[in-house]
Amino acid sequence: MLDMVNINSFTSEETPTDIIQTIFDKQAELMKKYWTKPVGEDIDTLFWSQEIRKFSKYTVEELAEAYQAMEMDWSRWEHSEEEMIDSLHFFIEKLLIANLTYKKILGYLGTDSEHVRNLIKEKAEKIKDWSIESLLRLATYHSNIADNRLRNKERKSEQLPTNRDLFYKETAEWFLKYLACFYSLWLNEDKLRELYSKKNQVNHFRIKSNY
């Protein structure tokens, strides 16, 4: 029966005032159930650098799977939606692991939440006619640029401090373009809220059920 549990097994919760902040809050609450270490402790360590890169990889992999499903068969849009929301969960988790809260993102972008939401919509409008391949390339490119600012890598013998301002600023820019890729398809703000809410409930259920 557990294998049958998915986003269609739940209903979305009521609409919050600030959808993006609510997504961050819900992800942080979920993470408390399985993270044994305090997240965002020190991104200068090799361990946390590796975790951040790992979640970037998960984010892009799920996005690629969603886009691939769309390219193969548009009738599989429900499958694509679930993969995209999985990607969003990994993405927000990566930001929180990096100690980059929504408030910090707004600070690095030098604006407020309402303006950011409008910026995302404006960017989405500019790329709405792009191919699936181009959208994925956009998301992947900015992920790699941001994570390349993490100085600690296994192949390096010397561990160096990360330029946090550069890493956070470029990750904040990735945040804008990543969500713009979602909005450029059919996942507008309301749809994103609905699907994230359902998937978040799925994940809580799976953790509670030891799935």
Model region roles, listed by residue range:
Residues 1-211:
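Flexible "arm" and connector segments at domain edges
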